Amino acid sequence: MTISPPEREAKKVKIVVDRNPVVTSFEKWAKPGHFSRTLAKGPTTTTWIWDLHADAHDFDSHTTDLEDISPKIFSAHFGQLGVILIWLSGMYFHGARFSNYEAWLSDPTHIKPSAQVVWPIVGQEILNGDVGGGFQGIQITSGFFQLWRASGITSELQLYSTAIGGLLLAAAMFFAGWFHYHKAAPKLEWFQNVESMMNHHLGGLLGLGSLGWAGHQIHVSLPVNKLLNAGVDPKEIPLPHEFLLNRDLMAQLYPSFAKGLTPFFTLNWAEYGDFLTFRGGLNPVTGGLWLSDTAHHHVAIAVLFLVAGHMYRTNWGIGHSMKEILEAHKGPFTGEGHKGLYEILTTSWHAQLAINLALFGSLSIVVAHHMYAMPPYPYLATDYGTQLSLFTHHMWIGGFCVVGAAAHAAIFMVRDYDPTNNYNNLLDRVIRHRDAIISHLNWVCIFLGFHSFGLYIHNDTMSALGRPQDMFSDTAIQLQPVFAQWIHKTHALAPGLTAPNALASTSPSWGGDVVAVGGKVAMMPISLGTADFLVHHIHAFTIHVTVLILLKGVLFARSSRLIPDKANLGFRFPCDGPGRGGTCQVSAWDHVFLGLFWMYNSISVVIFHFSWKMQSDVWGNVTAQGVSHITGGNFALSSNTINGWLRDFLWAQASQVIQSYGSALSAYGLIFLGAHFIWAFSLMFLFSGRGYWQELIESIVWAHNKLKVAPSIQPRALSITQGRAVGVAHYLLGGIATTWAFFLARIIAVG
């Protein structure tokens, strides 16, 4: 018999809470800055309001006790979920109360989605455009209509019911947030029981969550969509509970339902192949993924995660221990490997958050790319405005999450990292050879920058000199993306070779036939050429520069040759004195600030590339003569010069937003103008010196004193860090809103 050493013993799952730890009281709400001794005294200068905003959610600065911080974060998560559910409920309510959903459902190829009707105040009703079916409203591009159809919603009453359900759930979340902070707050020990947490999140959240969704897809979505696709009037379609209770009704659509669970228990699972399919490709009626494929996918995911939910060792002595896994993770060149990482991840929520943000951001970017190649919902692919919006939205979300990951990794380094617990493990080894990492990364950025832009500059020069035969293009000197083309080809051939059971490849974008719905292209093979090769190297360049800035911020967060005691100065500090050749803009916070601008560069190039490529090579109308694309295939011809991007993309496609005045799209014209102003306003904060403003303020205060109208709260210029924060916020807001107006006015007008 083997006796386990004590550290191998299972961590018993115990519910450990503090009863009534914090009194429920509104007193604190009446005292702004109650969390800080200095702020609670009230304002003496205008800096107070900025510090209040900067520190209100920085729980680390309120108390250093993790036992106190953890339930605060936990409780805040419930509040966050409550806010999300109220927002979601609002979306469903708009669908029920102000939308043309039922009309759209009856004719999704000709009627456009709208869920907002503007009141006739000072002529604003001009925004209510004709979206078809006799409905006037603002065309929406959020994809909710397509999502609702995919989930089997056939009436506005169902949307009302779901909206009310969302509000009830929100109330439950707000109650839980209050209860788990004021009545029964979990102890730190509970948050640190990672094996139990992994089992519950993997098995419960992802496993049972996917299983529940698969059940809904099979019992509600599939029958409803099958009837809708066959042209049955939504009002004639049975209600969801009828499909659930009446097996004969289901068996008419899916014969295997008549056999019940017999095939499941006799392991004759192929019987269920009529509703759990493995077709691949898109449904030619709707232009979306086969819903029977996505139901199959969710069943498979559920099985996978239900197994994963039993993987970690808790009350029974079987399964993995997270600490053991991490400490076993070492190779011949990695020193102590991941020893010490378990302690980091159970005591630093910043480290935990950094990893989650990095993964979540990457996932969002993966989602952006799947949404157009494999549109998951019916009639999504032919709604070009929604396709462009969803791609752009998921790219921005991904970019912000990745920068947030670097921010919290740097906060971890400054506030939570303990060098004594991390001797010669992988983290320590990375930090010790950070100079080699950063200098190599810097070299890569310089190489990529000069070479990728160099190719464009060469083309612009040759074009200006009238020497098209000397340009890099598909018709002159070719730089074909051979690896990408090979990947396309491999995936296009997969159904016959590597995926023998699939009837079609995962996406028509790899190759094959055009999928058209109602005469519009849903998806078709996307050919790659020299122009794509060029812009992909710009992507490589901008992404590497973003990583350089963010990684340098993390690796040099605690110390550098310039400022060895950086850790003592904190996460954000403006400068460290005038000596040493300049010590400003070196804090970890400043690296996040600078990284945001390069993240913005990266994402802008990606969404511009996507928008133009799709309009040029994919989106358009199918006629007897073939496919007529929106911009007629000009991407390959024009996008290989910088001048082409400026003239044939930005300028040519801005005509719709610039000329939108007096039409239903005029709001986009105003947003385009206003957002440019917000962007320009940011430059006032970014290109200015604090001393200039302080001097100006003091002369204005002098004038007020002369007139005896001086305020009791002394005005002060923004600190350097505050100015930069205001600057970057307006820069990003202005830039994103400008892009939004430009994209939507264009695609709604021509798409």
Swiss-Prot record:
Record keyword DNA repair present: no
Keywords: 4Fe-4S, Chlorophyll, Chloroplast, Chromophore, Electron transport, Iron, Iron-sulfur, Magnesium, Membrane, Metal-binding, Oxidoreductase, Photosynthesis, Photosystem I, Plastid, Thylakoid, Transmembrane, Transmembrane helix, Transport
UniProt cross-references to Pfam families, sorted A to Z: PsaA_PsaB
Membrane-traversing stretches: 73-96, 159-182, 198-222, 294-312, 349-372, 388-414, 436-458, 533-551, 591-612, 665-687, 725-745
A single GO BP: photosynthesis
Membrane topology note: Multi-pass membrane protein
Taxonomic source organism: Nephroselmis olivacea (Green alga)
This protein's GO CC annotations: chloroplast thylakoid membrane; photosystem I
Binding residue positions for phylloquinone: W693
InterPro entries: PSI_PsaA, PSI_PsaA/B, PSI_PsaA/B_CS, PSI_PsaA/B_sf
Annotated protein name in UniProt: Photosystem I P700 chlorophyll a apoprotein A1
Homology family: Belongs to the PsaA/PsaB family.
Catalyzed reactions: reduced [plastocyanin] + hnu + oxidized [2Fe-2S]-[ferredoxin] = oxidized [plastocyanin] + reduced [2Fe-2S]-[ferredoxin]
Signal peptide per UniProt: none
